[in-house]
């Protein structure tokens, strides 16, 4: 786990109540698909845990639903907003334990980390 500052690069409405947020910053603590981040929001006591959809060396993509005041606050964030983020949380998925043809099942916003898992499985030679 590492605490880092990330900058909102994009915050796009995908559908009613569903958003894609792209954050730029150091993602070196994210080592496996299925991990999550905790985002500190101004005026909120608790951080917001959000699954990582996908990541590169300098950005990460989050897909989230607005289900309360905290995620509503996130949906209004403009590009350039700087966020305090705990990264590299959770165990994630171990792609070395996957079979040759893994089956991924998920639904709603819970399917977001499966995108990153599918990418890593493809890189590992799974079909």
What are these regions (language model features)?
Residues 2-81:
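Ferredoxin-reductase
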